[in-house]
UniProtKB/Swiss-Prot annotation:
SUPFAM superfamilies: Acyl-CoA N-acyltransferases (Nat). Keywords: Acyltransferase, Transferase. This is Uncharacterized N-acetyltransferase SE_0851. InterPro entries: Acyl_CoA_acyltransferase, GNAT_dom, YlbP. GO terms for molecular function: acyltransferase activity, transferring groups other than amino-acyl groups. The keyword NAD does not apply. It holds the Pfam family Acetyltransf_7. The keyword Lipoprotein does not apply. It is an enzyme of class 2 (transferase). It comes from the Bacteria. Residues 7-146 form the N-acetyltransferase domain. It comes from Staphylococcus epidermidis (strain ATCC 12228 / FDA PCI 1200). Gene3D superfamilies: 3.40.630.30.
Length: 146
């Protein structure tokens, strides 16, 4: 299995994301997120991925939230927003999503995730808790505490 790599913010990353736009789910494209990060060149990239050879096959964004999320994490000063975890169709069910998720958990911070595209059961199997509420787009919100 590939190693989780920190993706740089540049036009090469935009090219790597092309397969996800072609084959992935429209809700997970990350076009605006990447463009916004490229404009602010001083920011650290929130993007991580797994390669098979030279091909990016799985990706996610981890956004470090430096404010208290009192609704879900009343005892924490910081948490991570796991944003748009996605694996290309032909590479699914090979453990890449779990590998990315375990990488996020290594930060030892609470994680808030939005379950898109029938991913709720996956998150529950990985130890996330359903807070039984939805985000403004109607997707389930799940949390994980270290």
């Amino acid at each position: 299995m590939g190693e989780v790599k920190h993706l740089q913010i540049n036009y090469k990353t935009d090219e790597l994301f092309a397969d996800f736009r072609e084959f992935g789910n429209k809700n997970l494209y990350m076009i605006e997120e990447l463009k916004g990060q490229m404009i602010d060149a001083s920011s650290d990239s929130p993007f991580y991925g797994i390669f098979v050879g030279n091909k990016l096959v799985a990706r996610m964004a981890l956004l470090d939230k430096g404010e208290v999320e009192e609704t879900y994490f009343p005892n924490s000063n910081d948490y991570i927003l796991l944003w748009k975890l996605e694996v290309l169709d032909t590479y699914q069910r090979r453990g890449y999503a779990k590998q990315l998720l375990n990488f996020a958990k290594e930060n030892k911070k609470p994680i808030k995730a939005i379950a898109r595209n029938n991913s709720k059961e996956f998150f529950l199997k990985q130890g996330f808790k359903d807070v039984e509420t939805k985000n403004p787009e109607g997707h389930d919100i799940l949390i994980w505490n270290p």
